[in-house]
Amino acid sequence: MSQPRQTRTFVRREGRLTQGQQRALEGLWPQFGVDVPERGVIDLDGLFGRAAPRVLDIGFGDGEALVEMAAADPERDYLGVEVHRPGVGHCLLCAEQAGLDNLRVATVDAVELVRHHLPGPSLETVQIFFPDPWPKKRHHKRRIIQPAFLDLLAERLVPGGALHLATDWADYAEWMLDTLEADARFENTCGPRAFVPPPPPRPQTKFERRGLRKGHQVHDLIYRLRPDTAG
């Protein structure tokens, strides 16, 4: 029996690769890239060459904020997921310049990666900063924050693991809040229906700066997986 078609939560916006980004994708991929297998889970200890707390960053954009976090946090390993090739190339260049050995990058559908290729429980933190808001109501099913995706995260996060979200779309912020508050497995670290007080504990991102220039308000949410309900 064929599997039901997965709803896409992203749009591939290829854009134009600079020569530097193209060279990075070709020359730095063996150092930082993750060739996700068609089947089976990734050996994270083998991938990073050690056992350490792990952070999954979904949709890292140009990667500058991700590299900054990984550089400031050498005791944890960072796995970034992004499908926009120019952003991936830029991230690889930044990672090389920073001399990182605790960052790896994959260019696959993040939902499929979590569902099929990550062992559980293996993640200390999952962070999703400024995902596609899919503002039209008929597209809300494409938003990555859905009850079914929380089911996957609850299986992959370690007990007490964190889910950190950020958006500059007020409607999506309320959607995130409603979805997570309805899930008893997750606890809001700032109190019921509370956003993180500014400034949030993360670097500013390219998409965040763009939203601020448009006059958008940024909302951060941090939830923890209750230890007694971990998958």
UniProtKB/Swiss-Prot annotation:
EC number: 2.1.1.33
Class of the enzyme per the UniProt entry, highest EC level: transferase
Catalytic activity: guanosine(46) in tRNA + S-adenosyl-L-methionine = N(7)-methylguanosine(46) in tRNA + S-adenosyl-L-homocysteine
Xref: NCBIfam families: tRNA (guanosine(46)-N7)-methyltransferase TrmB
SUPFAM superfamilies, sorted: S-adenosyl-L-methionine-dependent methyltransferases
Region called Disordered, residue ranges: 194-214
Protein name: tRNA (guanine-N(7)-)-methyltransferase
Residues the record lists as binding S-adenosyl-L-methionine: D57, E82, D109, D132
Active site: D132
Ligand binding (substrate): K136, D168, T205, K206, F207, E208
GO CC terms of this entry: tRNA methyltransferase complex
Alphabetized InterPro entries for the sequence: SAM-dependent_MTases_sf, tRNA_(Gua-N-7)_MeTrfase_Trmb, tRNA_methyltr_TrmB_bact
